[in-house]
Amino acid sequence: ASIPRMFCETDSQTYELTSSAEERPIGSQVVLHPKNDWMHLFEYDTFKKILVGYGEVLPYPVYLHHQDEEELVNTPSPVWLDPKATRKELLDYGAKVFQSSALDVFRIRTESGRVEGVLYVLPFRTQFSVRNSHKVYLKRMLLSEDDCNLLPQWAFFIRCLVNADGLLSTASRESLVSNDLLKDARKEIGMAIKDYLRGLVQNNRAMFNKILDVHHFHIKAIASEDNELLRLFMDYLPFETNKGVRNFGSIRSADNVICYTRNLEDFRQVRRIAGAQGWLVVNAAYTFDETLLKKYARLNPELTLDEISPSRLLEQFGEVEAKK
């Protein structure tokens, strides 16, 4: 039989390899001795919390021994990686993990980076500058509660619970290495989100409307960069007009000429005059709105955009007065 070997660190932070006279079973055993400054991390409750946090979904059983008792602390087959799990089970699990409900949940899987898991649609509005909490695992061990740049920049209405088997971590194991593989994985995840929304428009309009009510700003961001989704989503997107908020479908059906203003001050000055003349004017001062109008008009030549300004209205009224 082979002689057991021991690889030990000394107080001088050097290492030595020695033989052990004690018989040991086949395998490896790692013994860690905390330094005095870190003894508090090895108190039972603290240690268990850390162990569960990082190792909860490791694919092998992990046992914690304490006072002659043995406790299984992980779930080698978590519900969010179970293809047979129901939507309700996934929503319930997400509510437990993130302490927040979700509007909906859907599965993703990528070829690049071998990312697998579920994405939750947040039930509240978020700003582009706000960082949401996530759970990103690398080879089934928790890596970060940040999205690690796995999500596209516009996907702030999404919370991810995913595991990546084919991506690399930074040396500090605090995030994922930014390389072409991560970029390709992010692109696939972006396509999965778009496919999900496309499917809702076609098959579950009620759910799409719920998401649109909360996250129309983010849906506009998606539509502004994807012509196919622009065609699909545009009629449902809300725009502010001098006659209240209307979806674009109702604006387009009113007239093939769409009048709009580029900034809020112009809109405030124009809205009453336009209302008196019976015109419908869109306030395109908000982020993405003018871009969406112009891109949609280019894709639909039968539509004409007409930019309205206070000075132009005054000129038109002057011409009318001169003709009298």
Regions found by a protein language model. Give the residues of each.
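Conserved GHKL (Bergerat-fold) ATPase module
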Residues: 1-324
